[in-house]
Amino acid sequence: MTYHPKSDFLRVMQERGYLADCTDKQALDEALSKGVVPAYIGYDATAASLHVGHLLNIMMLRWLQKTGHKPITLMGGGTTKVGDPSFRSEERPLLTPDKIDENIEGMRKVFARYLSYGEGATDALMLNNAEWLDHLNYLDFLRDIGRHFSVNRMLSFESVKSRLDREQSLSFLEFNYMILQAYDFLELFRRYGCRLQMGGSDQWGNIVNGIDLTRRVLEGEIFGLTSPLLTTSDGRKMGKSAGGAVWLNGEMLAPYDFWQFWRNTTDADVGRFLKLYTELPVEECDRLGALQGSEINAAKILLANEVTTLLHGRDAAEAAEATARAVFEEGGVGGALEVVELPATTLGEGLSVAHFLVAAGLVASGKEAKRLVAESGLRFNNEPVGDANAPVTAATVGEELKVSIGRKKHKLVRLS
């Protein structure tokens, strides 16, 4: 039997497809209906930017704020030093404190695009769990917190069990991660009255640990809510493309390439992605997702424009669309294509096409470049390139050279 939420937030989560599991849906709905509920999602600082795989949870925080509640973005300055073992086949490399701080700064820029931070009742908070984790006394922590955890139960969580079943090592350092994340929820409840933790469904075990700990220590009524682990209709994990991670920071992925990622959405995913990654009405998302044939291309452009506008602004989205039109329909260049600067000294008196592509960072290897040429997948200034050993000189590049790899990847190369 379908539950019909009273609260705007839970209704949005259910209608738009964000909701996978909830520890107590009716009690949470009641709390959300009565007043402001602070809720958090934790982010370990393992990279200099978040990627598209994080975007679904960021949109959940955005909807939380839009429906009158308080989002908390918790930076894992402390837990990143340990590393989350959930569903990983090997231990994460350890990062230096300086690198962790640098990564947090990169993530901060992304959150500022989606959430309004400040001191008001529903303004977002950005916190760092290093604030309380860095100063823990180990013996006190074991006595006061560790005694509430059952190792038997921790070993039963699928995220850990799957690793042990494959006879892969799980360090004591990583095993502690679950306790530290649970402690985060306790501290957030104690300090900020935070009553809800959200995350991907792979975090269910960690979230439940935090709820159990907080109830035992502080007798708090708190909740957990998870989103589905999203894949595309053809089974690919969200956040990845053929060219690698789809980063949210403009310095790591040009707005045009971000726009193009969404424009290339498969037909079967359009309606679902419109509901999850834009703020268009659900009925409109369903209508657009049901379009067939060439008509659905307009819906894909709308999807790309809406998602890019949220992250990079309306001007960047319009520039990306104009560039795509110039590149694909008119064979031109457009103003938003990413520019690759190649030192003139690297080019020297000339490189082969294969070596030129590698030097410019457009392919990973000479072998890949040769395969690209052999499959007629390379063009310079819209002209097919048929010889991977042909010379590329300064005269070839000129003021700038438009390099097209396949039908959808286009860059401008300039000599510096």
From Swiss-Prot:
The keyword tRNA-binding does not apply. Keywords: Aminoacyl-tRNA synthetase, ATP-binding, Cytoplasm, Ligase, Nucleotide-binding, Protein biosynthesis, RNA-binding. InterPro entries: aa-tRNA-synth_Ic, Rossmann-like_a/b/a_fold, S4_RNA-bd_sf, Tyr-tRNA-ligase, Tyr-tRNA-ligase_bac-type, Tyr-tRNA-ligase_bac_1. L-tyrosine binds at Y40, Y177, Q181. Its EC number is 6.1.1.1. Residues 351-416 form the S4 RNA-binding domain. It catalyses: tRNA(Tyr) + L-tyrosine + ATP = L-tyrosyl-tRNA(Tyr) + AMP + diphosphate + H(+). It holds the Pfam family tRNA-synt_1b. GO terms for biological process: tyrosyl-tRNA aminoacylation. HAMAP family: Tyr_tRNA_synth_type1. Homodimer. Catalyzes the attachment of tyrosine to tRNA(Tyr) in a two-step reaction: tyrosine is first activated by ATP to form Tyr-AMP and then transferred to the acceptor end of tRNA(Tyr). Belongs to the class-I aminoacyl-tRNA synthetase family. TyrS type 1 subfamily. This is Tyrosine--tRNA ligase. The gene is tyrS.
